[in-house]
Amino acid sequence: MVPPEEIASASNPDIEGENILHFLCREGDITDLMAFKNVISDANRHLALQFNRHGKQCVHIVSNPGIADPQEKLKLLMEWGADINGQERVFGNTPLHIAAYTQNHKLATWLCNQPGINMGIYNYLFKTPYYVACERHDLKIMNILRAKGTRCGVYRCRDAWLFTQKY
């Protein structure tokens, strides 16, 4: 078996444009990622910020549905310097946008409780996470975001007007 130190120092992406952290975030569980905890240093911290060929960083990969332990993985990635407000290159979605698009209430709640989270970032389609939740008529995520102080307004979503206010 190749030691984690050697793997982490090999920052060359594979044919999919993914480094080892991209792979572990998508395919591994938290114990696989924890094996790298003592290996990540200033010399290879950039691995947590690299984009794959699909324009996604590790924070976007773990925010997708079907990924094991997304909150725990995000905690580790943030310790390693990953940006919780980082935008993917294709649509400009943040992890919070992805949670709203996929209606992942648990992840949205966790993200909204993180220091430094920006709930008002617009993606490249000029949508905030709140607007995405509004489009999907996901009142639970809308309430989560409102409870944490997101700016709300009047949105026309799917031919219906939703009037919201800041509480």
Swiss-Prot record:
SUPFAM superfamilies: Ankyrin repeat
UniProt xrefs under Gene3D superfamilies: Ankyrin repeat-containing domain
ANK repeat residue intervals: 54-86, 91-121, 125-154
GO BP term (any one): symbiont-mediated suppression of host NF-kappaB cascade
Family: Belongs to the polydnaviridae I-Kappa-B-like protein family.
Pfam families: Ank_2
Function: Suppresses the host immune response through NF-kappa-B inactivation. Possesses ankyrin repeat domains required for NF-kappa-B binding but lacks the regulatory regions required for dissociation from NF-kappa-B and degradation. Therefore, prevents host NF-kappa-B release and subsequent activation.
Protein name, UniProt field: I-Kappa-B like protein F2
Keywords: ANK repeat, Host-virus interaction, Inhibition of host NF-kappa-B by virus, Repeat
Matches recorded under PANTHER family: NF-KAPPA-B INHIBITOR ALPHA (PTHR46680), NF-KAPPA-B INHIBITOR CACTUS (PTHR46680:SF3)
GO terms, molecular function: NF-kappaB binding
